[in-house]
Amino acid sequence: MLIVADENIPLLDAFFAGFGEIRRYPGRAIDAASAKDADVLLVRSVTRVDRQLLEGSKVRFVGTCTIGTDHLDLDYFADAGIHWSSAPGCNARGVVDYVLGSLLTLAELEGVDLNRRVYGVVGAGEVGGRLVRVLHGLGWKVLVCDPVREASEGGEFVSLETILAQCDVISLHTPLQRGGEHPTWHLLDQEKLASLRPGAWLINASRGPVVDNVALRELLLDREDVHAVLDVWEGEPQVDLQLADLCTLATPHIAGYSLDGKQRGTAQIYQAFCRWRGEPEQVRLADLLPAHSLARIELDANADPAWALATLCRAVYDPRRDDADFRRSLSDDVAEQRAAFDLLRKHYPVRREIEGLAVGLRGEAPQLAQMVSALGAELVGVA
């Protein structure tokens, strides 16, 4: 069996070497010639997998180590009898950590109390849904817009217009859909962006084209009160340099790039592959993940809650480093800038998730205990 895979997928040998030969390619370089003799194709979001890539090939299973599937032509897969799997939720926790880190940075810049903000989450799937649970757990006011879930479940969802009118912070977590009943391409267009509240914060860690980047650039030029945090870009790896300069935080599509999330994505497509072949799983992710480099953090019961929140979140992730690295990589030379974008992702430093963090409390502190629980960290006793 020949397995063609994106070279940046972690643990390929650990999970797939037992099935046959693995050939690795840069994700953007996987083409019809490299896929022609493959039985299995393993990709990330940078590889468009469609008829043009696979027609005439031997590929019968496609796995993408991502939550999103907008780079896969699922209609063609159905017609061609190609089995496929994505990795829903694999990096959800990493994205939540990214959003929390961004909120802390913006709060420091603006001198605002995060407890007093109103949060709007657009898209409440694996990522957005987890973010909503964390924000609710912290006791913050959250409004949620998800027309797909609203139609199937009912519940306390609101319209996008309500989010724009009432929320100080808007975090986008939708898939990219160009058509259908609920398209998300340019969900925030010029008109929608113009209705942002004074002093609004906009975070996009979903897909670049969910926001009209040209319209956002023009808005930020006109309104200094609005802060934008962009991890995803229209046309990436090429980036609108002026827009990046106008963003308060700008990063190269790494919001979900925790070590745990990336390895979890590989594990999920391995599990789907085993189910497709009707074989038992021989490898477990729990046996491969390294121990958390930070053993534990201890907090005094009288610690300031705002300080404690920042300490815990930044113990695992602070977006300011990624922002600085990204800005240093930006170049007027398009080819150089595109290459730098991919290199930052390829050589991304090890980053763990807050759920692997152990936190000890010295003394009785119900508010801090609730915060630790909401963040998903492990509350442990202090001797």
From Swiss-Prot:
<comment type="pathway">
    <text>Cofactor biosynthesis; pyridoxine 5'-phosphate biosynthesis; pyridoxine 5'-phosphate from D-erythrose 4-phosphate: step 2/5.</text>
</comment>
<dbReference type="GO" id="GO:0046983">
    <property type="term" value="F:protein dimerization activity"/>
</dbReference>
<keyword id="KW-0963">Cytoplasm</keyword>
<dbReference type="GO" id="GO:0051287">
    <property type="term" value="F:NAD binding"/>
</dbReference>
<comment type="similarity">
    <text>Belongs to the D-isomer specific 2-hydroxyacid dehydrogenase family. PdxB subfamily.</text>
</comment>
<dbReference type="InterPro" id="IPR036291">
    <property type="entry name" value="NAD(P)-bd_dom_sf"/>
</dbReference>
<dbReference type="Pfam" id="PF00389">
    <property type="entry name" value="2-Hacid_dh"/>
</dbReference>
<feature type="binding site">
    <location>
        <begin position="205"/>
        <end position="207"/>
    </location>
    <ligand>
        <name>NAD(+)</name>
    </ligand>
</feature>
<dbReference type="InterPro" id="IPR029753">
    <property type="entry name" value="D-isomer_DH_CS"/>
</dbReference>
<feature type="active site" description="Proton donor">
    <location>
        <position position="253"/>
    </location>
</feature>
<dbReference type="Pfam" id="PF02826">
    <property type="entry name" value="2-Hacid_dh_C"/>
</dbReference>
<keyword id="KW-0664">Pyridoxine biosynthesis</keyword>
<feature type="binding site">
    <location>
        <position position="256"/>
    </location>
    <ligand>
        <name>NAD(+)</name>
    </ligand>
</feature>
<comment type="function">
    <text>Catalyzes the oxidation of erythronate-4-phosphate to 3-hydroxy-2-oxo-4-phosphonooxybutanoate.</text>
</comment>
<feature type="binding site">
    <location>
        <position position="174"/>
    </location>
    <ligand>
        <name>NAD(+)</name>
    </ligand>
</feature>
<dbReference type="InterPro" id="IPR024531">
    <property type="entry name" value="Erythronate-4-P_DHase_dimer"/>
</dbReference>
<feature type="active site">
    <location>
        <position position="207"/>
    </location>
</feature>
<dbReference type="InterPro" id="IPR006139">
    <property type="entry name" value="D-isomer_2_OHA_DH_cat_dom"/>
</dbReference>
<feature type="binding site">
    <location>
        <position position="257"/>
    </location>
    <ligand>
        <name>substrate</name>
    </ligand>
</feature>
<protein>
    <recommendedName>
        <fullName>Erythronate-4-phosphate dehydrogenase</fullName>
        <ecNumber>1.1.1.290</ecNumber>
    </recommendedName>
</protein>
<dbReference type="GO" id="GO:0008615">
    <property type="term" value="P:pyridoxine biosynthetic process"/>
</dbReference>
<feature type="binding site">
    <location>
        <position position="66"/>
    </location>
    <ligand>
        <name>substrate</name>
    </ligand>
</feature>
<dbReference type="GO" id="GO:0036001">
    <property type="term" value="P:'de novo' pyridoxal 5'-phosphate biosynthetic process"/>
</dbReference>
<comment type="subunit">
    <text>Homodimer.</text>
</comment>
<dbReference type="InterPro" id="IPR038251">
    <property type="entry name" value="PdxB_dimer_sf"/>
</dbReference>
<dbReference type="GO" id="GO:0033711">
    <property type="term" value="F:4-phosphoerythronate dehydrogenase activity"/>
</dbReference>
<dbReference type="InterPro" id="IPR020921">
    <property type="entry name" value="Erythronate-4-P_DHase"/>
</dbReference>
<dbReference type="GO" id="GO:0005829">
    <property type="term" value="C:cytosol"/>
</dbReference>
<feature type="binding site">
    <location>
        <position position="231"/>
    </location>
    <ligand>
        <name>NAD(+)</name>
    </ligand>
</feature>
<feature type="active site">
    <location>
        <position position="236"/>
    </location>
</feature>
<dbReference type="Pfam" id="PF11890">
    <property type="entry name" value="DUF3410"/>
</dbReference>
<feature type="binding site">
    <location>
        <position position="45"/>
    </location>
    <ligand>
        <name>substrate</name>
    </ligand>
</feature>
<keyword id="KW-0520">NAD</keyword>
<dbReference type="InterPro" id="IPR006140">
    <property type="entry name" value="D-isomer_DH_NAD-bd"/>
</dbReference>
<feature type="binding site">
    <location>
        <position position="146"/>
    </location>
    <ligand>
        <name>NAD(+)</name>
    </ligand>
</feature>
<keyword id="KW-0560">Oxidoreductase</keyword>
